[in-house]
Amino acid sequence: MIDINLIREKPDYVKERLATRDKELVSLVDKVLELDKRRREIIKRLEALRSERNKLSKEIGKLKREGKDTTEIQNRVKELKEEIDRLEEELRKVEEELKNTLLWIPNLPHPSVPVGEDEKDNVEVRRWGEPRKFDFEPKPHWEIGERLGILDFKRGAKLSGSRFTVIAGWGARLERALINFMLDLHTKKGYKEICPPHLVKPEILIGTGQLPKFEEDLYKCERDNLYLIPTAEVPLTNLYREEILKEENLPIYLTAYTPCYRREAGAYGKDIRGIIRQHQFDKVELVKIVHPDTSYDELEKLVKDAEEVLQLLGLPYRVVELCTGDLGFSAAKTYDIEVWFPSQNKYREISSCSNCEDFQARRMNTRFKDSKTGKNRFVHTLNGSGLAVGRTLAAILENYQQEDGSVVVPEVLRDYVGTDVIRPE
């Protein structure tokens, strides 16, 4: 959530930054200013009416002691009460609308973020590794997986419908190996491993910015008013909701493996085949809760931590800085890491690493006590995939495929998997 004081004091700046995302967002700022003005007018009027009521109440007591008639003043007090009740209800509605409007406004892009409309305006930062030159036509991962008997799309559809897959045999072992490898790597770097709930309350999703804007993309358990998590970022970041942290305990590094559940409401026709875009997929998440002064240094380190997974797996990739029009709702700055897919002859996103600054912290009310000023300040929150497991598995199948249909297991995974090569069963 954007600081309403910033909107009050620098409305033109806020509008300018939001317009780099989408010009239509400017109208939300005007609505906030209008509601905020009305709110303050009501509060001022209420204070005046309450003051008058208090004075008259004292006057009634005085007149009664003197044995004088108080009918006229009592009638006025009754009128004041009715007016105060009406204004208090109006204030409640205005404040609710103001809060809801603020919840729909995305984060302000950091000034360093390149201005652009969509992914075509993203800026490549660096590449690592050389894409393998095949002496045969590389097959797509879904074809490789089906031939190996490790990806079963028909049975996945039989069980749950489209965009669900059964991963079996050596594929299941490879999936588990990737999860353990990623968690082992991150915990050695100081990330604390967490096993969070997969069902969360609505306010938890409001905290990280999925609600209210992205409700259509979430799975909801109506009877219990709980949502399946779309990413472990949601429970991990909210662990410190409504808390005041000690400055000396920052930074906090967290990691978790969870399945993620997404309706993919806006993905019709995209990545229909394979396991690139699923309703349920595994992911290892990285979350940082840090001091505001260090958050951009922490972002660069976060990207490096995600990159190291791909480097150790020997998978070629590139790092891309997202432009303003392609930024996620809660992010002030984001780097995407894209891994090479030979069958598509292009890089595909496998990790997104973002600094949300204090945007999520304001929604969660997560603060720390500043040792210099003694005042409470909002923390900065960061998150990144470390990595999306299914996409990593797909990238391994494609980059390590052999002409005979087998797949070589990356060296760092062999002890986890228990074999050097996966062959057709």
Swiss-Prot record:
The catalytic activity, as recorded, is: tRNA(Ser) + L-serine + ATP = L-seryl-tRNA(Ser) + AMP + diphosphate + H(+); tRNA(Sec) + L-serine + ATP = L-seryl-tRNA(Sec) + AMP + diphosphate + H(+)
**InterPro entries recorded for this chain?**
aa-tRNA-synt_IIb, aa-tRNA-synth_II, aa-tRNA-synth_II/BPL/LPL, Ser-tRNA-ligase_type_1, Ser-tRNA-synth_1_N, SerRS_1_N_sf, SerRS_core, tRNA-bd_arm
Indicate yes or no for the key word ATP-binding: yes
Q: So where does ATP get bound?
A: 262-264, 349-352
Q: Name one Pfam family in it.
A: tRNA-synt_2b
UniProt domain comment? Consists of two distinct domains, a catalytic core and a N-terminal extension that is involved in tRNA binding.
Protein name (database record): Serine--tRNA ligase
Q: Which organism is it from?
A: Aquifex aeolicus (strain VF5)
Which taxonomic lineage is given here? Bacteria, Pseudomonadati, Aquificota, Aquificia, Aquificales
UniProt lists the gene as serS
